Amino acid sequence: STYQVVTGAGNAGLALLEQPFNVIPHIPEEETKMEAETRKIMGRLSRGKVRPADFSVVASCARVWVRDGHLESVVVTVDEEPTLDEVVEAFSAFRSEIDGRDLHTAPKEPVHLFTEDARPQPALDAYLGEAEGLPGMTAGIGQVKVTEDGRIRFFVLSNNTIRGSAGGSVLNAELALAERVIGP
């Protein structure tokens, strides 16, 4: 389930600002798009085409009256039941493919793992990465749990306008330039 800020709706979202403290449990076409895009992102490139990952994604999307940051509740089913320590270690040890590439908009900490309760929160954590001078480029993960039936459950927060849009686009361009996919 995603809880997407009103600014994520562009100009149409501005009308929602007139309905403060509200949650709208439907974003037209967003659930279908999210299900398909997740499988594409997690898929493989084969013969110049993306082959979507072979697993199901079930999404629910709500628009929330928050200034910045999309919050997502994620439940993952895995083949072998992990321990909570293994999941926490995997998140803590995560390193991006762009680590060490000296890209100006790449945060040193692409993912921040919260161990305290009730985090991440858009009001408190939408600008993670501020210490590095890259506010909003770090995603936050928290409330990590392994359920009784072995599923991994957590919340993830990312800044929709900085990491998800403008900053993410600049970072992609920097990477494309570094990889010589595009020229100066």
What does each model-identified segment do?
Residues 2-151:
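C-terminal substrate-binding/catalytic lobe of Rossmann-fold NAD(P)-dependent oxidoreductases
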Residues 22, 159-160, 172:
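Asparagine-centered polar/low-complexity signal
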Residues 29-32, 164-170:
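A glycine-rich, Thr/Ser-enriched phosphate-binding loop motif common to dinucleotide/cofactor-binding enzymes
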Residues 62-66, 158-163:
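Glycine-rich phosphate/pyrophosphate-binding beta-alpha loops
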Residues 81, 146, 159-162, 177:
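Short, glycine-/Ser/Thr-/acidic-enriched flexible segments
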Residues 149-150, 163-165:
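Short active-site-adjacent structural elements
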Residues 152-158:
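Short, well-ordered beta-strand elements
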Residues 167-184:
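Amphipathic terminal alpha-helices
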